[in-house]
A protein has these predicted regions:
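Conserved inter-motif catalytic segment of the P-loop NTP-binding fold
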Residues: 5, 17-18, 60-147, 151, ...
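Helical mechanochemical/support elements of P-loop NTPase systems and associated helical scaffolds
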Residues: 73, 77, 106, 110, ...
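Conserved RecA-like P-loop NTPase ATPase core
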Residues: 22, 67, 77, 129, ...
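DNA transaction DNA-binding modules
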Residues: 223-314
Length: 314
């Protein structure tokens, strides 16, 4: 047993792979629909960690990265690395790919690679692309809450604890924009990174992050000509999170009228109507750059906003 004083006297060490996103010895999941860019996102993350560079404005701790691919071969991965302008060396990036005659990679067969990566190279980040391409000895149903929550994720957590690295699992979203086995995965991993592309817009990707250890995160991203993810210009203006929620809503609605009281209540914003009104008025030009045009009209005793979304040409 420990007293509260003993607990407070113990040194607190918070190690991270990516600050505010991924802690050391954690298990995380990146999910998205096909063609959104899960593998590109993961390779960009790997490059940032391998070289100690910021990732989407977040600090990283430098570490070698092991990339386990169950879908792409080395040629395909090299094409993406070169297109994105990523810079890896023989000492900071390692690839384990699925053999041509294999249907899935057996997790037990990866033990020697994982051990070598952790002990001989000091690696702290393992990316598994994709979760469904990994075979466990007893088999499992990806849609089974019990299999995922009581067997699959605990297996990866066991490896994380044993070798002292963080694991990022890449997984699919289904047609309803929830991950296969989602409830169990959400409750079992340390954090979920979700990428979604709105059906009405091709240039913007929305990142949502939920975690046990860090604050939630909502970002609007775009991909540049080299396929690298960047924070949208709108985000670089320190945009209030409530305005991001409003923009996401506006993209879906396209044309609508509202008052600040109505929209604050409808979207359950964590802000007062008067505060949201001030933020909205201060960002009219920024919103217009993103394709959202807003006009104001005075009707009776209320100020009414008329919003129209037009997809940006760029």
């Amino acid at each position: 047993m420990k007293t509260i004083s003993q607990m407070r006297s113990e040194p607190i060490k918070k190690d991270f792979i990516v600050d505010k996103l991924m802690k050391s010895r954690g298990v995380y999941c990146l999910v998205a629909r096909p063609k959104v860019g899960k593998s590109l996102f993961a390779l960009q993350l790997a490059n940032s960690v391998a070289n100690g560079q910021e990732f989407l404005g977040l600090k990283t701790n430098t570490s070698p990265v092991l990339y386990i691919s169950t879908e792409m071969n080395s040629t395909q991965i090299l094409e993406r690395i070169d297109k994105m302008g990523l810079h890896f060396t023989d000492n900071n990036f390692f690839l384990k790919e699925q053999e041509v005659n294999e249907r899935k990679l057996n997790l037990m067969d990866l033990q020697l690679d994982l051990q070598d990566f952790a002990y001989n190279y000091g690696g702290k980040l393992v990316i598994i692309d994709m979760l469904c391409g990994i075979r466990l000895d007893n088999g499992y149903d990806i849609n089974s809450y019990q299999d995922i929550g009581q067997y699959v994720i605990p297996k990866f957590r066991e490896l994380s604890n044993k070798y002292g690295f963080t694991i990022l699992l890449i997984h699919h979203l289904n047609k309803s924009n929830t991950s296969l086995g989602s409830t169990a995965i959400d409750g079992s991993v340390d954090g979920m990174i979700t990428l979604k592309k709105d059906n009405n817009i091709t240039t913007k990707i929305f990142l949502n992050y939920e975690s046990r250890d860090f604050e939630g995160l909502d970002l609007i991203l775009k991909r540049n000509e080299n396929l690298l993810f960047e924070i949208s210009e709108l985000e670089t203006e320190d945009l209030n999170p409530n305005l991001i929620i409003f923009l996401n809503y506006a993209i879906k609605q396209r044309d609508f009228e509202f008052t600040v009281s109505e929209i604050t209540s409808k979207l359950n914003l964590n802000i007062t109507p008067s505060q949201f009104g001030r933020i909205l008025n201060a960002n009219i030009d920024n919103l217009q750059k993103e394709g959202l045009y807003i006009e104001q009209q005075r009707k009776a005793k209320a100020r009414v906003y008329i919003a129209q979304y037009k997809e940006p040409l760029e």
